Amino acid sequence: MTVLSISPVGPHDFELCLRNARSFSPGLFQDLTVFRTAVRIQDNPTVLEIRQIRRKPPALEIRTALPNNASEIKRLARWIIFADLDLRPFYRIAASHPILGTITKELHGLKPMRPASLFEMLVIAITEQQISMAAAYRIRTRIIERYGERVNGLWVFPTPRRLRESSVADLMTCGLSRRKAEYVKGVAHEVADGRLDLGRFEAMSDEAVRLLLLQIRGLGPWSAEYFLVRGLSRPDRVPADDLGIRSVVGRYLGRGQRLSPQGTLRKLSAFKPYRGLAAFYLLAYERMSKYHAG
C-alpha cells in the first residue's frame, strides 16, 4: 500500500466537494470522508482513495495499491480534485454581490471534481448532450462496465483504443442513440490514432481548444464550453446554451425566469474572469439545497 499526502491550494473543503458530487449522483458518495475512484496510471489499473486529513491549511491523504509512480499518483489526484484551483480571487469578486456573496460563504471551500482523463471528459460531454445528468450517468455506467476494467470493486474507464474497437450497435445497447454512438466511436478513433492529441490542450488558449473541438463530429458549442470549464479548469468559460445554467442564473441573478444564452452571459459578466465558477456555485447551491430538502 502506497500512502502519500498532498496540500491543495486553500480553501478546500473536501467533504463539501463530496456532498456536492453526491447531489448530482444520488446513491454515490455515501461515505463523505473518503473518495474512491478507479484510474489508470501508466497502463496500470488501480484505485485511489483520497481523504482530507486537515482543513486549515488543507491536506489530503492518498492511498493506492500501486507501489511506484508517486509523482504521477499525486499529479492525477491533484488533477481530479482541482487541488491547484485558487478560489480566493473569485471570492473577492463575489463578496460584494448580495446573492453570490452569501452563497460563497455558505459553500466556502467548494471545488468541482472531474474525471481522471480528458478522453473520459470528451465522452461525458457527448453523453450529456440534451438529456438529464442522471440518464447520462446510467449510460456511462453501462459503457464502463461493458468496455472498462474492474479493479477492487470499481471500474476503470475504457481506453480510446477499446472504444475504437467497439461497434456502433454494441454502443447503442448501452443506451446511446445511433448518432451519439457514432460520435463516441469517432472521438475514440481520433484519440487512439493520434490525430487528436489531448496532451496539448493544457498549453493551448481557450479559443484554440474551442475551435479544435468544433472540428470534431459530435462536439458543438455546448460540449466545447463544458469541456473547457470542467475538463481543463478554465473558470471563465460558460456553456451558456445549457438549460440548467440558464434557469439557475435567471432564478438567482435575474427575475426568476430562464434567460437566453446571451442574457445568461450578461448576468454573469460581473464575475469575470470567473463566470464559469459563478455558474458552478449557483448550480451547486441549488442542487445541494434540493438534495437536503428531499
Model region roles, listed by residue range:
Residues 1-294:
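HhH-family (HhH-GPD) DNA N-glycosylase catalytic core used in base-excision repair
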